[in-house]
């Protein structure tokens, strides 16, 4: 628990991503999903640049305080706290089997 409470101090960069509520439940969900897709792209880009990355959720009960600190609009859902930095060691490259491609065409 103590390690989790101080993880923000160990990363040189923390990106906070939030999604605003929509005018309908569907738009609220679409906003959240679009932000999540963008976060995945950030993580892939960070990996490409050789950075370590970690997607974490907002601490329980802290959503409104974090959103206010970030000056996000009222009602914003904190979708991710993204920790970025240079890794202490390189992760081993995992050999993957060749992709199986199926073509369906007329």
For the regions a protein language model found, what residue spans apply to each?
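Structural motif
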Residues: 12-15, 52-53, 80
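Short, electropositive alpha-helical surface patch
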Residues: 66-79
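Glycine/small-residue-rich phosphate/adenosyl-binding loop
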Residues: 1-35
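C-terminal helix-cap and adjacent tail motif
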Residues: 78-106
């Amino acid at each position: 628990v103590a390690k989790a409470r101080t993880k923000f101090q160990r990363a040189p960069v923390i990106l906070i991503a939030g999604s605003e509520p929509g005018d309908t439940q569907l738009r609220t969900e679409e906003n959240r999903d679009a932000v999540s897709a963008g976060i995945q792209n950030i993580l892939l880009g960070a990996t490409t640049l050789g950075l370590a990355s970690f997607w974490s959720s907002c601490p329980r009960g802290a959503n409104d305080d974090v959103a206010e600190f970030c000056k996000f609009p009222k009602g914003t859902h904190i979708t991710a706290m993204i920790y970025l930095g240079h890794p202490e060691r390189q992760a081993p490259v995992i050999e993957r089997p060749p992709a199986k491609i199926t073509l369906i065409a007329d």
